[in-house]
Design a protein with these regions (language model features):
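Solvent-exposed soluble domains appended to multi-pass membrane proteins
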Residues: 1-261
Length: 261
């Protein structure tokens, strides 16, 4: 793994914000090298990365401390408060991105904050995580930097615990990955319309929420959801887009994936 070998030909949110002078940090409770995360965040925005080993180096946890993927989300949120205050004190634009993992497959991690509300461990962990996110957001709203700060909350994927979903009798439920924006700077041109969108659309939408003006309201294959423009799946349908994305692309394989002209 090098510092910039993860799809070096793409231009990501971190690249855009770096160009605008943002201080950027990625905060996780596990090893930064897992799944190429270090390569991506160093190569696309020069993020400072605070991971499991950073917490050890700073004396926050003992050398032999290891739960779940490294340290639990309860600690992650507390560390994030310190990091946010440090970033805000510089009086420069900042982007703190953090990844929670207590709700990961299988069954999640039961921390000291979890309550025994439900019969299933996973249900208790999900409820506990929701409370922690809510309390963290409430804390952010009380800080001086909040008025000029946008918060994006996004799931990376649905749960992989299909057995749990079946036990909850939720197999017929149209499950969606959670995504919301709090205190965004953009105005929604379709406030009462249910949108059909994919992860591709979150790129321009997130930047628009930060106040970025996007010519044509499109970046890459994504559409700014604040705009009145149709997304690709609204225009062509999901099945058609899936077929097109499976086709071979020389642009992707050479330019985006490997950074070659």
């Amino acid at each position: 793994e090098s510092d910039n070998n993860y799809v070096p030909g793409v231009w990501a949110i971190g690249d855009v914000l770096k160009g605008e002078g943002y201080n950027q940090e990625f905060l996780i409770g596990s090893d930064k090298k897992f799944a190429g995360r270090s390569s991506y965040f160093h190569g696309h925005g020069n993020y400072d990365i605070f991971d499991y080993y950073t917490a050890i180096d700073r004396g926050y946890i003992d050398d032999d401390y290891m739960v779940w993927w490294g340290y639990e989300d309860e600690k992650l949120f507390e560390y994030a408060k310190n990091e946010l205050n440090n970033l805000a004190s510089k009086d420069e634009p900042f982007n703190l991105t953090m990844l929670t993992v207590d709700t990961h497959f299988t069954d999640g991690y039961v921390c000291e904050l979890c309550q025994n509300q439900y019969d299933e461990q996973y249900s208790n962990v999900i409820a506990c995580s929701s409370r922690q996110v809510s309390e963290f957001l409430d804390w952010i709203k009380q800080q001086d930097f909040y008025d000029n700060t946008t918060v994006v909350i996004s799931g990376d994927h649905l749960t992989m615990d299909s057995d749990y979903i079946e036990r909850q009798n939720a197999t017929d439920f149209n499950r969606r990955t959670y995504f919301t924006i709090v205190n965004g700077a953009a105005v929604n041109e379709k406030p009462c319309v249910e949108r059909e969108y994919t992860t591709l659309d979150l790129y321009p939408t997130t930047l628009a929420a930060l106040g970025v003006q996007i010519e044509g309201n499109r970046l890459g294959l994504g559409t700014n959801l604040y705009s009145g423009e149709d997304t690709l799946i609204e225009k062509y349908g999901l099945d058609y887009i899936n077929v097109e994305l499976l086709k071979d692309s020389q642009l992707y394989r050479k330019k985006l994936l490997y950074g070659k002209n």
